[in-house]
Swiss-Prot record:
GO cellular component, one term: basolateral plasma membrane
Topological domain ranges for the Cytoplasmic compartment: 1-14, 96-97, 143-149, 215-225, 283-311, 373-376, 468-759
Subcellular location: Basolateral cell membrane
UniProt protein name: Na(+)/H(+) exchanger beta
């Protein structure tokens, strides 16, 4: 032990020296020369020196090239998230400047910094944009697309998306071609097809820019779905026009057959994309039917099938955006019925996170690509392009709305038209399409410069001023509160009611076709795509059950669920009673009777269309009157049973019947005080309730269904007795006691020290 303690300081110094030597020699090669071995031979002897060189084991090494790409991607994402976080931490800034504007400014600063240090700034590559950054944004928009507003306004959306985009493309292309023919502009070499190609690139409204701005101003649902739906559905028109004019530019000549094939190509691209997306959506729904034992992989099927739908559409040169929208819309109701609540939460937040990161990166790369260049500036061409974008948008919206309002029930007001026209923002899709132009195109750099200028003008000027304009014009905002169960149930009820009205009138509108589609979906589609679907439950009851469960889950998650359980004493007084069930045979017989009585009237009403020259027969009028009388009688019986139940709830009986009754009982009302003597106090007789009847006791021979009455305690009050002179006073006493027994009891808001009756 002493020897060890003496030697310990020396060991510590040696260990320190070893550590210093290792850190000094990190990554440095250390050469060691081995001793020379000499070999002597009798014949041809020679001397050979063998020098062995070896490296020390590197404790710490740096190899940046090995992780360069993923490391830089992670740094870009981290930068985007930090900018997004800092933006929302400054409320004054976020209230004035849209998030997209700030991100573009950050991209400009980062691109300038990269260029200052002598590096080449990265450019938003079209393949990276279309295959990696755009799909999450479109999938998020399509999966959570509000179906009801979209379907109710799909006609208006298609008019703006198809006809409006065609108008913008040809209007801008034609006027720009006329501008280029002026010699002072210096662009006389630009032909018509090149101008039309540029017009098709700039004419489309960008969904990324629209989402970034309209989500912050909280505009009303109608205007939002019109602008956003147009930005989603105009992709097919943009793709067809871009490919068409690019191909015509290479060929040089255009025939009538080429124009006809271009029109056919539009329908193939749009409808083909929808078909591909719907197929993958049904596959995702069918796959989710068998994931009850492996819940952890449920979200992956949603993401993978959606991305495969997009890639398959792009592979066949179809509209990938429409494929993603169709896939999300088709799969959502079936997938959410099969997956667990945790998987639904995972899908929701992952899509929101993924789309938010992609949107942030797109705007930052727009700023960086602007610095990277190259640019070709022409003041006349660029300024004219910006002005024509505004003019064509305003004229197109006003002209199309004038025609659309003739067919709409809810008209688009002047304020709505202004917001729709002012909200036509351009974004990264236009830049990526311009970047796809070949380097040999003589106008490529000028087109890119004009496109970037239009994007900056729409995002900065229109995006920053649209919120003050909405406040100034007092445009209706979106309702933030979610509809209650009562509102949604009545909305569903009104849909069925309007379907019946359309059937009676003989006019088959969208409510009729919606009912047909829902019936087909419930009868055939859900049977194969939803696991354990209860088809025997009525649709309205199933909808109410679903909404009630959804609201209960929301209340539990928010911590607003009140305590509704009864007390322990009340629970002890509840006696469990076996509820008899109706047999299948008897239930089918009841259904047959109800169907025979209700369906006949429905068939009679639908058998003929409305005509003011046609009168109903007398027997049909008698049948209608008989049905009304039956319904009135059933309603009266229901009200009587409700009154009996309320009386039985508030009628009290003395606990000890054998206790001597006092000589005088005092009954005090709020209006007056009256004292009853023992002789004048009326007698109350009580009858025991009869035992409850079972469903087997229901007679099926009657055509109408009797409302079952709840057994209650009945009280029979004898009238006052006395001579003729006291009849009036006795009747008053009798009425007061009857009021006492039939009154529902004291108000809960009254104080406890003021009882209703005291004995």
């Amino acid at each position: 032990m002493p020897a060890f303690s003496c030697a310990f300081p020396g060991c510590r110094r040696d260990l320190l020296v070893i550590v210093l030597v290792v850190f000094v020699g990190i990554g440095l090669p250390i050469e060691a020369s081995a001793p020379a071995y000499q070999s002597h031979g009798t014949e041809g002897s020679h001397l050979t020196n063998i020098t062995n060189t070896k490296k020390a084991f590197p404790v710490l090494a740096v190899n940046y090239e090995h992780v360069r790409k993923p490391f830089e991607i992670a740094l870009w994402i981290l930068l985007a998230l930090l900018m997004k976080l800092g933006f929302h931490l400054i409320p004054r800034l976020s209230a004035v400047v849209p998030e997209s504007c700030l991100l573009i400014v950050v991209g400009l600063l980062v691109g300038g910094l990269i260029k200052v240090i002598g590096e080449e700034p990265p450019v938003l590559d079209s393949q990276l944009f279309f295959l990696c950054l755009l799909p999450p944004i479109i999938l998020d928009a399509g999966y959570f697309l509000p179906i009801r507003p979209f379907t109710e306004n799909v006609g208006t959306i298609l008019v703006f998306a198809v006809i409006g985009t065609l108008w913008n493309a040809f209007f801008m292309g034609g006027l720009l071609y006329a501008l280029c023919q002026i010699e002072s502009v210096g662009l006389s070499g630009v032909d018509l097809l090149a101008c039309l190609l540029f017009g098709s690139i700039v004419s489309a409204v960008d969904p990324v820019a629209v989402l970034a701005v309209f989500e912050e101003i909280h505009i009303n649902e109608l205007v939002h779905i019109l602008v956003f739906g147009e930005s989603l559905l105009n992709d097919a028109v943009t793709v067809v026009l871009y490919n068409l004019f690019e191909e015509f530019s290479k060929v040089g000549t255009v025939t009538v057959l080429d124009v006809f094939l271009g029109v056919v190509c539009f329908f193939v691209v749009s409808l083909g994309g929808v078909l591909v997306g719907a197929i993958y959506g049904f596959l995702a729904a069918f796959t989710s039917r068998f994931t009850s034992h492996t819940r952890v992989i449920e979200p992956l099927f949603v993401f993978l099938y959606s991305y495969m739908a997009y890639l398959s559409s792009e592979m066949f040169h179809l509209s990938g955006i429409m494929a993603l929208i169709a896939c999300g819309v088709v799969m959502r109701p079936y997938v959410e019925a099969n997956i667990s609540h945790k998987s639904y939460t995972t899908i929701k937040y992952f899509l929101k996170m993924w789309s938010s990161v992609s949107e942030t990166l797109i705007f930052i790369f727009l700023g960086v690509s602007t610095v990277a260049g190259p640019h070709a500036w022409n003041w006349t061409f660029v300024i004219t392009t910006v002005i024509l974008c505004l003019v064509s948008r305003v004229l197109g919206v006003i002209g199309l709305t004038f025609i659309i309002n003739k067919f709409r029930i809810v008209k688009l007001t002047k304020k709505d038209q202004f917001i729709v026209a002012y909200g036509g923002l351009r974004g990264a899709i236009a830049f990526s399409l311009g970047y796809l132009l070949s380097n040999s195109h003589q106008m490529r750099n000028l087109f890119l410069t004009a496109i970037i200028t239009v994007i900056f003008f729409t995002v900065f000027v229109q995006g920053m001023t649209i919120r003050p304009l909405v406040e100034l014009l007092a445009v209706k905002k979106k309702k933030e509160s979610k509809p209650s169960i009562n509102e949604e149930i009545h909305t569903e009820f009104l849909d069925h009611l309007l379907t019946g009205v359309e059937g009676v009138c003989g006019h088959y509108g969208h409510y009729h076709w919606k009912e047909k589609l829902n019936r087909f979906n419930k009868t055939y589609v859900k049977r194969w795509l939803i696991a354990g679907e209860n088809f025997k439950e009525p649709e309205l009851i199933a909808f109410y059950r679903k909404m009630e469960l959804k609201q209960a889950i929301m209340m539990v998650e928010s911590g607003q669920l009140p305590s509704v359980l009864p007390s322990t004493i009340s629970m002890q007084n509840i006696q469990p009673r076996a509820i008899p069930r109706v047999s299948k045979k008897r239930e089918e017989e009841i259904r047959r009777i109800l169907r025979a009585n209700l369906q006949n009237n429905k068939q009679k009403m639908r058998s003929r269309s409305y005509s003011r020259h046609t009168l109903f027969d007398a027997d049909e009028e008698d049948n209608v009157s008989e049905v009304r009388l039956r319904k009135t009688k059933m309603e009266m019986e229901r009200r009587v049973s409700v009154m009996e139940r309320r009386m039985s709830h508030y009628l009290t009986v003395p606990a000890n019947r054998e206790s001597p009754r006092p000589g005088v009982r005092r009954v005090r009302f709020e209006s007056d005080n009256q004292v009853f003597s023992a002789d004048s106090f009326p007698t109350v007789h009580f009858e025991q309730p009869s035992p409850p009847s079972t469903p087997d006791a229901v007679s099926l021979e009657e055509e109408e269904e009797e409302v079952p009455k709840r057994p209650s305690l009945k009280a029979d009050i004898e009238g006052p007795r006395g001579n003729a002179s006291d009849n009036h006073q006795g009747e008053l006493d009798y009425q007061r006691l009857a009021r006492c027994l039939s009154d529902p009891g004291p108000n809960k808001d009254k104080e406890d020290d003021d009882p209703f009756m005291s004995c």
